[in-house]
Amino acid sequence: MSSWNPTSKLYAKTTQIPDLFHDITKSPNIYTLLLELLGAYIYSNSQNLSCIVYDPNGTLKKIIIFNPILKFVTTRPDNTNEITGSDILCAINSIKPQQVKAYAEALFRYTQRLTFFISQILQKASIRLGATDISLHIYHVSQINKYVHEIRDYQKKTEAKKISVYLMAETADNITQFKRAADPSWTVLNINKLDINDDSELFITNLAEVEILATSKAVILDYTNPIDRLVFIKRRNKMDESFVKEVDNKPWFLV
């Protein structure tokens, strides 16, 4: 006679899928870190899975508020499925830029403390978000003529007699050289950060400038720099993108 037991389970044991995993310590700088985190976030959403984010110093908890898809941990976990660069690239290439911006808006919700510091910087500089006509970020003096040409083209197309230009720059020489090349009808604005020696303060100031560029009516970017790629995805979907220029006409990419 068969020894079959009618109470035994006839179904196979469910195989548990390992959590997705992202390690921020591999990022070369904080701005690339944010872009790569966005890539991991988009990929996790595409797989309908949560993601464990290895953040040993608690950096991200100081920047963005809780997100149900991401779980920040300070100890590297075992039995995880690490997200690769190819995973991120496939996820990004499968959606439109407008969708990337929507994901960025959902992810980059700054903490109350960080938002306060950014507001203080803008208030001290007397800069109101959305009030600047055109903004740019200069890295090299050799690029100035290209930026000047683009700004003149913008002014011609808008038929504005006077315009406000926000300049994000890393050196005093870049600021001086640009102001020399600027037309008299331009009001050039910038935040003085050249005397900042603290990395955290500089990062917050740069984030404030990202907000200025992201809300400016027009912007000229250089996608070789992660800050400018961050600016692009933080620009609101409803904004007129016809005045978003890349200094060398390169296409936008995440990482």
Where are these regions (language model features)?
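Short His-Asn-centered micro-motif
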Residues: 54-56, 137-138, 166-171, 220-224
